[in-house]
Amino acid sequence: MYNAAGRREESLACHLAVRNQLLKNGYREGSILLMVDNNMSVVYLDLGRPEEAIPYLTEALELAKENGLVGPAVAEPTWNLARVYRALGDEEKEDIYLKAAVEGFRECYPPEHPKRIAAEQRLKERQGE
């Protein structure tokens, strides 16, 4: 909510507070921590600090794997990693995550979903179409 309103530092502070409380309570199951990590990465991207998003997105994907989560739980952080590596100018890593994100979005979102459209369009751009 704060991030959408342009209040990114407040958004980051709230996400960090929730994340710290979850970890303090020993919570590493399910999708809540994964969602917090993924959402924090979006804030870092919006702040122009993509490198700071990498550890949170890596953890989000690890949590998905540890907990047998699929669909958006994997596709969303994968898409955001593609966005991070695009922002960092690492085309090789962007391509790896972009292809995986498109596959994931095709499995869990309808063709008209905005993120699926954006990912497919970016993949076409990367492939020179």
Q: What is each of the regions a protein language model found here?
A:
Residues 24-28, 66-70, 107-111:
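Short coil/turn linkers that connect adjacent helices within long alpha-helical scaffolds
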Residues 3-4, 31-46, 72-83, 114-125:
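Conserved alpha-helical positions within TPR/SEL1-like repeat arrays
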Residues 40-43, 56, 60-61:
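Fold-core signature of tandem repeat domains
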Residues 4-15, 24-25:
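Extended non-membrane alpha-helical scaffolds
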Residues 92-110:
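TPR/TPR-like (Sel1-like) alpha-helical repeat modules
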